[in-house]
Curated annotation (Swiss-Prot):
Main location class: membrane
Official protein name in the record: Uncharacterized protein C4H3.03c
SUPFAM superfamilies membership: Six-hairpin glycosidases
PANTHER family registered for this protein in UniProt: GLUCAN 1,4-ALPHA-GLUCOSIDASE, TREHALASE
């Protein structure tokens, strides 16, 4: 299909690209999802959890910002090495066009942040004709606006998008490099049922060496600039390149999978909200886990579980500053514990629980009619006891890899451990956030054991005062024995999903050796892995080399619908196999290598992952997803160590 057929502003039946045919750029405040066609298909503004301005991937009426060749072209997308600057190239017989997308990042501390989406278009061979379309749809396409076009100078145009509420005003700057390139902006008001408030289009012909920059910004946000010069754009691009290259140079991983690990680390960095140090699960919302299905969630918040794993991964790679910032965020969360002494499972990026209520946007069709489209997340009301394990593991790694924790944080840790001791027997919703009945999920019990184990390690290593250390030790051991006694199905030979569902297999138990709960070569665990690796049709969880969380046809989680294989647990299996492989089972190491290499091929063309993957290799769910990149990094790290032990190349 020609690109211009896909991106017409009047296309009521617009067909978005596949989820994995997008790149992402960001500035640690927000991000933009950009398709291989050169279209901004999702962007929330000015923060990750703000309402969307562009969200056409969910509905043709939800706004877009496209820069697309008019001729039939082939296209390729890549990041500039060691940066999060996205290159999209369009190739035709007439010429080659390059589209450069980035958000500015200041390199020097004294530089201000220009919170702009910058899109630079240049013709690098021959001639190219392009079409610009900018049609915002404010507040998830719920608020109308007025579009105005101004001619600032002979060759400088500016479009303004003024919300019905009057504030804030959004600006599109058109900045040509040189006077030879002539531009014009045409004001368009399509039918009301598409984009209420209109937008702008422009047709341009670029010759070799010509360049034009389009900048989307908000009036009053960032430095005050009346109009943008090409020289300023050059400086912002150079500063952004320097920032990303300096950041990734801190990475201490130098193993076999260096490029893969660094790209996923760069992706994780984009998911950090810089003002607070919070880490979001994903910058997108309501991308489906099953095409046409109902499993469509909003992940633009900071889950304690996801963010703790993220900081664990970044700290292991040598990125200490992010761990320090996150620990500051966590300390403030712990200072505001609930009345019962616990904490919430999810917070806003600002550290509170506001604007998290789940709402269905019934006016949006959803990605390929996958509805409802949801914002907010009802999981905020869940009890998910496993979060205390992930939290304590991240604090333990922080204390070990970054800097010793402060005494005031230790006091908060003690209170958390007391809460764990008092509540570990309660059923919960656990890691999969089921919307059915609460259970005594094994994953939660394992992570509650981790919480007490890591706290005890910190106490003994640092000689920190621990008045209830005997209670913690006794409870830790009691949890362990409960898991081994009630969580293992002796007849079928696997660790089960929960104490109640003792005959149901769940891939979350693969975490056991990863958190040092059990030896990777313990017969019970090896038998569990064997069962998980059986085909779905033979009561296992594997299909086409991919692992499902659990069998939806056997276990009803209260959500309904189907889903794809879960990327994170696929990598957990690689880790577990590699650990067993270097502990006396070399064939399992070979299996781990083969599976890892297959999983690398399941990544997007930019080497990051969505939450899930279909059996036909399509990405499903929100993308990029922190969980998936974290697990990919950890698997590469463990596999590299295991291969080094066996001196394999």
């Amino acid at each position: 299909m020609p690109p211009n057929a896909r991106v017409s502003y009047g296309a009521e039946k617009y067909l978005p690209r596949e989820i994995d045919n997008h790149g992402i750029v960001g500035n640690m405040h927000t991000s933009a999802m950009i398709s291989l066609d050169g279209s901004v298909e999702m962007m929330c503004w000015p923060n990750f959890d703000s309402p969307s301005i562009f969200a056409r991937i969910l509905d043709a009426r939800a706004g877009h910002f496209s820069i697309t060749p008019i001729e039939q072209t082939s296209c390729k997308q890549m990041y500039e090495p060691s940066t999060n600057i996205l290159h999209t190239k369009f190739y035709s017989e007439r010429g080659v066009l390059r589209l450069l997308d980035f958000f500015h990042r200041p390199w020097e501390d004294y530089e201000p942040l220009y919170p702009w989406l910058i899109r630079r278009v240049s013709c690098i061979r021959g001639t190219s004709r392009i079409k610009l379309e900018c049609f915002p749809a404010l507040d998830y396409a719920r608020q109308s606006h007025e579009t105005r076009v101004s001619k600032i100078t002979e060759n400088y145009y500016q479009a303004e998008f003024v919300p019905a509420s009057g504030d804030p005003k959004y600006i599109l700057d058109c900045v040509p490099s040189g006077d030879q390139l002539k531009i014009d902006l045409e004001l368009i008001y399509p039918a009301e049922h598409l984009i209420e408030g209109g937008g702008v289009i422009s047709y341009l012909e670029l010759e070799e060496g010509q360049e034009i920059t389009f900048i989307f910004r908000q009036e009053g946000l960032g430095p005050n600039v009346d109009y943008v010069t090409p020289n300023l754009v050059d400086k912002l691009e150079d500063s952004t390149k320097r920032y990303w290259r300096a950041w990734i140079q801190q990475c201490v991983y130098t193993g076999r999978y260096r490029e893969f690990v660094q790209r996923n680390a760069l992706t994780l960095k984009l998911l950090i909200y810089e003002p607070t140090g919070a880490v979001i699960a994903s910058p997108t919302f309501s991308l489906p886990e099953d095409l046409g299905g109902v499993r469509n969630w909003d992940y633009r918040f900071t889950w304690i579980r996801d963010s703790a794993f993220t900081i664990y991964a970044l700290a292991q790679l040598g990125f200490r500053a992010e761990a320090v910032e996150y620990m500051s965020f966590i300390y403030h969360v712990l200072k505001k514990k609930n009345k019962d002494g616990g904490i919430n499972i999810v917070y806003s990026i600002h550290g509170d629980s506001q604007n998290l209520e789940e709402v269905e946007l019934t006016h949006l069709r959803g990605y390929y009619n996958s509805h409802p489209v949801r914002i907010g997340n009802a999981a905020v009301h869940h009890l998910q006891l496993d979060i205390y394990g992930e939290l304590m593991d991240s604090i333990y790694i922080y204390d070990k890899k970054c800097q010793p924790i402060a005494y005031d944080l230790w006091l908060e840790v003690r209170q958390i451990c007391d809460y764990v001791c008092a509540n570990w027997k309660r059923p919960d919703k656990s890691i999969w956030e089921v919307r059915g009945q609460e259970r005594n999920f094994l994953y939660s019990k394992i992570m509650l054991w981790v919480a007490l184990d890591r706290a005890l390690r910190i106490a003994f290593t640092r000689s920190l005062p621990c008045p209830k250390h005997m209670v913690w030790m006794d409870t830790r051991d009691e949890i362990y024995e409960a898991i081994m006694d009630s969580g293992y199905n002796m007849e079928k030979g696997f660790f089960a999903q929960s104490f109640e569902n003792n005959d149901i297999l769940d891939a979350s138990v693969l975490v056991m050796p990863l958190v040092s709960f059990i030896s990777p070569t313990d017969p019970r665990f090896l038998s569990t892995m064997d069962n998980i690796m059986k085909p779905l049709e033979k009561d296992g969880l594997m299909s086409n080399g991919l692992i499902f969380r659990y069998n939806n046809f056997v276990y009803e989680d209260g959500v309904g619908g189907d889903e794809g294989a879960f990327t994170m647990v696929c990598f957990w299996l690689v880790e577990a196999l590699a650990m067993a492989g270097c502990s006396g089972y070399p064939k399992l190491l070979s299996t781990a290598v083969s599976m890892f290499e297959d999983l690398v091929r399941y990544s997007s063309h930019l080497q990051y992952y969505s939450e899930e993957c279909s059996l036909s290799s399509e990405s499903l769910g929100n993308s990029p997803q922190a969980f998936s990149s974290i697990a990919a990094i950890a698997a590469a790290h463990i596999l590299d160590k295991a291969l080094s032990i066996f001196n394999e190349i």
